[in-house]
Regions:
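Acidic (Asp/Glu-rich), glycine- and aromatic
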Residues: 66-68, 72-78, 179-227
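Bacterial N-terminal signal peptides
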Residues: 8-21
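Active-site/ligand-binding surface loops and adjacent short beta/alpha elements
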Residues: 203-288
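Beta-strand-rich N-terminal accessory domains
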Residues: 27-99, 103, 198, 204, ...
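Beta-strand elements of well-folded, non-transmembrane domains
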Residues: 156-162, 174-178, 192-196, 215-219, ...
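N-terminal secretory signal peptides that target proteins for export/translocation
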Residues: 1-6
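Extended, loop-rich substrate-binding clefts of extracytoplasmic carbohydrate-active enzymes
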Residues: 102-182
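Beta-strand-rich recognition/accessory modules
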Residues: 280-352
Length: 352
């Protein structure tokens, strides 16, 4: 986590210093192989508000930026084309596959919810109804393919009161690296800037990560569903069933009870679906102290900010910026077969 005290252009940190865990020769050989791993295409549709990223003609993921409560990635496809994430769930319909947001209060204004802006929609029966609070995609700054990688950069604005009150600006960067066999890696940096005045962050102590990922139920440790009117007195009933997924962190802990709110360099969520094991891992920034991770067996997980910026109000002064960098590894196999620990070592050594 980095705080930057300037409104000038923010540079993405790519060169890292953590020691590699792989043999030097193997690490050195990786970049050339990755550059030729797959052909990348970008397909942008402003009418639909989507930017599709394809590897060898197959969809890898889509950046959703149209009339949405907040821009997000969905779907995020596994190497064999299964949806690793889910866009909207019941319960927790505010979850958005892969998303980034938090509650914030611009000095002199009310608290705005950018964690769950869905609930601020003016007319909940009309999908095209505006949102009182919203993270809005402003424009793309970069869409390029170079040396076998894709680089995406977008300008966003966190807005309250139907767009009348700009709260913060955001610069979002995603570097896409194909790994072969349908696998790929996303190097993501999210930077928010208090461009319009002091902003007080008001995160919930428990229910937040930065960013969040919500796995599809077919990859979750537990499956939950709502049975309408099936509970006592005709109330809705939440049903939980054992799923196929497994959560594993860098320290060897397994599943939600052992990994939630525990410090780790990375957390992996994998499952065997239709006889094929695949998964998604979140990597923390190797240049920062390892964070605590929020994890849930029903499918949600992600890194948190440092303790002094978690679960308690803190102020981002006017002109200051706050950045979060993570890696997302989409892989075949489980945590071992997918070489998650080795891939993190590559990331830390600047080889991804």
């Amino acid at each position: 986590m980095r705080t930057v005290s300037s409104l000038g252009r923010l540079a993405l940190l790519i060169l890292l210093a953590a020691p590699p865990a792989l043999p030097a020769a193997e690490l050195a050989a990786e970049p050339a192989a990755l550059a030729a791993a797959a052909r990348i295409e970008l397909k942008r549709d402003d009418d639909q508000g989507t930017l599709q990223v394809l590897l060898d003609g197959r969809e890898a993921f889509v950046y959703q930026y149209g009339h949405v409560d907040m821009p997000h990635l969905y779907p995020v496809q596994s190497p064999t084309g299964k949806s690793l994430t889910i866009q909207k769930t019941d319960p927790y319909p505010h979850h958005r596959s892969v998303w980034f947001g938090d509650d914030g209060e611009l000095a002199g204004h009310r608290r705005a919810s950018f964690y769950a802006p869905l609930y601020s929609q003016v007319n909940k029966q009309d999908p095209q109804s505006p949102y009182r609070d919203r993270i809005r995609h402003v424009k793309f700054l970069t869409e390029e393919i170079q040396d076998g990688q894709a680089n995406l950069e977008a300008q966003l604005r966190w807005e309250a009161d139907l767009g009348e009150v700009p709260v913060m600006d955001e610069l979002r960067r995603i570097r896409v690296i194909p790994l072969g066999g349908g696998q790929y890696f996303l190097d993501c940096t999210f930077t928010v800037t208090a461009a319009y005045g002091d902003v007080t962050f008001r995160s919930d102590q428990t229910h937040y990560a930065w960013p969040y990922v919500r796995m599809h139920p077919q990859f979750a440790v537990e499956r939950t569903r709502i049975e309408k009117g099936a509970g006592p007195g005709g109330k809705d009933k939440t049903v939980t069933e054992t799923g196929a997924g497994t959560i594993t962190n860098s320290e060897g802990a397994v599943n939600g009870a052992a990994t939630c709110m525990k410090v780790a360099r990375w957390v992996d969520y994998s499952a065997t679906v239709d006889g094929i094991s695949e998964g998604l891992a979140i990597f923390s920034d190797p240049q920062e102290p390892p964070p605590k991770f929020f994890t849930r067996d029903y499918g949600t997980f992600g890194p948190r900010r440092p303790d002094e910026q978690s679960g308690k109000p803190f102020v981002l002064g006017k002109g200051e910026s706050l950045s979060q960098r993570v890696g997302l590894l989409i892989h075949t196999g489980d945590v071992t077969g997918g070489r998650v620990a080795e891939r993190y070592a590559q990331y830390a050594a600047g080889q991804l």
